[in-house]
Structures are given as structure tokens and as C-alpha cells.
Amino acid sequence: MGCGSRAGKMEQHNAGKPHVAQKHCIGCGQCRKICAHGAPIITDKKCAIDHDKCLGCGRCIAICPKDAIAPDCDEIAEVLNYKIAEYAKAVVDGRPSFHISIVRDISPDCDCHPENDVPMVPDVGMFASFDPVALDLACAEAVNRQPVLPGSRLAETADPEDHDHLHAMHPNTCWRAAVEHGKKIGLGTDDYTVITVK
């Protein structure tokens, strides 16, 4: 999301407003506390989201201790990833660009969330490329090759057979959709070779 302005990031998230699975909601109010817009409303120890106030940022989804809040459907996460690729294309299209990713302190949630946990995997390193799609893919695949750090939230939830750490942490988020869409719109390719410099 680094290529989007603050307003652009809000627009990227705005495709889907969350809903609450009432049977899982315990009425703790964590969602209400984290929402800057007062969208979650607690009535009779159950939450409902006022979609007129909701901007779709997803903070309530991340903080819910019972996973009672979710986007309307899996398609919404895919749309978000498409928008991320489209915003990046709008910024770099027709301009010379070089991209650097520092892959360290890989937290289970977006770093904008104050309730974030310890890193899921060891630090990987720094990656650089003229191709932003290949760079993102190389970074994600490098993260997925790392061992899970004990004591991390991923260690508590990971399936030993699932080596996609990013998917294991957020099953409704299709990070690969951004890569595929980035290729489709001409942002970059999925062709990369890692050259290690020590």
C-alpha cells in the first residue's frame, strides 16, 4: 500500500465493510475502542457495524478476540489486492523506478495496527529490483521459506503442512492476487532470480 496516499489507502480498503457474526461476538467493545469513526455499536452485549460511519479500514477485524468481525466476503480481499497493484501502477507507470524492500520484523498484521504481535519469522534481509511485482513475490516467497518463530501468533495457529505463512495468518487475504493482477496490468512480472550479496 506504500504507493497510496492516506486518502488512497482508505479508498483501497473501502470495497468491503465488515459484518459481525453475532453468535461469536462477546460484546467486549475492543472494536469500538479502536475505531476512530464510532462505527461499531454495542447493544445487549453484541456488536453491529454502522456502515454509514465505517470507512472499511479493517482495524475492528484485526482486534476482535473472537474473530467475530469479517469482511463481507473473500472477494473483497481480492479487490483490495487488485487496488494495491493498480495504485502502484499509477505511481510508477512510464517513470524510471527502483524498488527496495527491507524484510524484517514481519508482524502478523499490518504495521498500522497498534495491537500487533511479535514477528512471525526471523528477519530475512533486504531485496531490490526494478520490477515491483517480482520484488513482492520474491519477498513473500522468502518469508514463506523461513521457520516459524516460537512464541509468535503464527506458531499458535500455523498448520505444519501449510508453508504459506501469510495465508496461514490471514486465510481470507489472497496476497497472490496482487501479484497476478500486477502481471495482468503490466506492472511487472513474476520472473526473478535472487542474487545474494554478502
List PLM regions with ranges:
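Extended, low-polarity segments enriched in aliphatic/aromatic residues
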Residues: 1-198
